[in-house]
Amino acid sequence: GIRSQPRSRGLGDVYKRQERILAIMKDSHIGSYGVIGLIFYFGLFYLLVSSLPIELAGCAILAGDPFCKGVSSMIINRLPYARKEEEAKNKTVYSRMTSREYVFSIICAFLPLLWLPQPVYLLAGIFPVITWYFLTSFMKRKIQGYTGDCCGATFLLSELSFYMGFVIIYQTI
């Protein structure tokens, strides 16, 4: 359900203690800030994608979605899970990737970039990497790890940054 609260929720919360932040994030109800965030996400996604010609928008989505998922998946190699395994919502805690899994993940992330019509659009891939780095640094400072919610938010924001970079490149060439 949707719930309005006078304070922020999760990572942006005014609380400083890791335990309190994680307790708030464990609540599966979406708050008013979550609703506002989703409205901004879908609005910005629509504005960015619709500002491109249809063929280019299709290429951006086909390349950007899997690339950003690959970038975001690296969160498990940079940060530990922030909760104890028995406290996880779905009782699943991911372990770091082996070298083989890491290489396979990188290959799978980069292969869809072949959909891009010109090599200059590869520069859009820098944006999600920078976004991922700053978000994971923030998570490390606030909760000393990641949660499933953090993974989802990292993907969505990385994806938006890819489309922003793509549109910037399109408008400058």
Please report, for each region that a protein language model flagged, where it lies by residue.
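Single conserved hydrophobic/aromatic residue that forms the stacking wall/gate
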Residues: 1-15
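Generic alpha-helical secondary structure signal
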Residues: 10, 16, 20, 105-106, ...
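Short, flexible active-site loop motifs that bind/organize anionic cofactors or intermediates
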Residues: 1-4, 23, 141
